[in-house]
């Protein structure tokens, strides 16, 4: 009676597969006329979370070249106070 335990579940069982999701396409590669400008906070806000963090490229869908440009533009916009450094809900 002392060894009456629930049966252990194996962790190597079949896993549920994620449904296939279409790969996001970099909007800057798709539309060559759209440019990344640090003086345009409206465009940059799309790539910043509400807490003020830069959204990673696996979520935003940017290619690595444009993600680096976005990151630099966001940092420049923060430096000249066009974008807040922290989100609107942050307290210090």
UniProtKB/Swiss-Prot annotation:
Q: Which SUPFAM superfamilies match?
A: Ribosomal protein S18
Q: Which GO terms describe its biological process?
A: translation
Q: Which UniProt keywords apply?
A: Ribonucleoprotein, Ribosomal protein, RNA-binding, rRNA-binding
Q: Which Pfam families match?
A: Ribosomal_S18
A single Gene Ontology CC annotation of this entry is:
cytosolic small ribosomal subunit
Q: Quick one: where's region Disordered?
A: 1-22
Q: Which InterPro entries match?
A: Ribosomal_bS18, Ribosomal_bS18_CS, Ribosomal_bS18_sf
GO function terms (MF aspect): small ribosomal subunit rRNA binding; structural constituent of ribosome
What the record says about family reads: Belongs to the bacterial ribosomal protein bS18 family.
Its assembly, as annotated, is:
Part of the 30S ribosomal subunit. Forms a tight heterodimer with protein bS6.
Purpose of the protein: Binds as a heterodimer with protein bS6 to the central domain of the 16S rRNA, where it helps stabilize the platform of the 30S subunit.
- Protein name, please? Small ribosomal subunit protein bS18
Taxonomic lineage is:
Bacteria, Pseudomonadati, Thermodesulfobacteriota, Desulfuromonadia, Geobacterales
Name of the coding gene: rpsR
């Amino acid at each position: 009676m002392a060894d009456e335990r629930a049966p252990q579940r194996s962790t190597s069982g079949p896993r549920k597969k994620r449904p296939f999701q279409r790969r996001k396409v970099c909007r800057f590669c798709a539309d060559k006329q759209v440019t990344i400008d640090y003086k345009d906070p409206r465009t940059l806000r799309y790539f910043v979370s509400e807490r003020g963090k830069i959204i990673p490229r696996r979520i935003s869908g940017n290619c690595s070249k444009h993600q680096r440009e976005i990151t630099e533009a966001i940092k420049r916009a923060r430096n000249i106070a066009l974008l807040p450094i922290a989100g609107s809900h942050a307290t210090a």
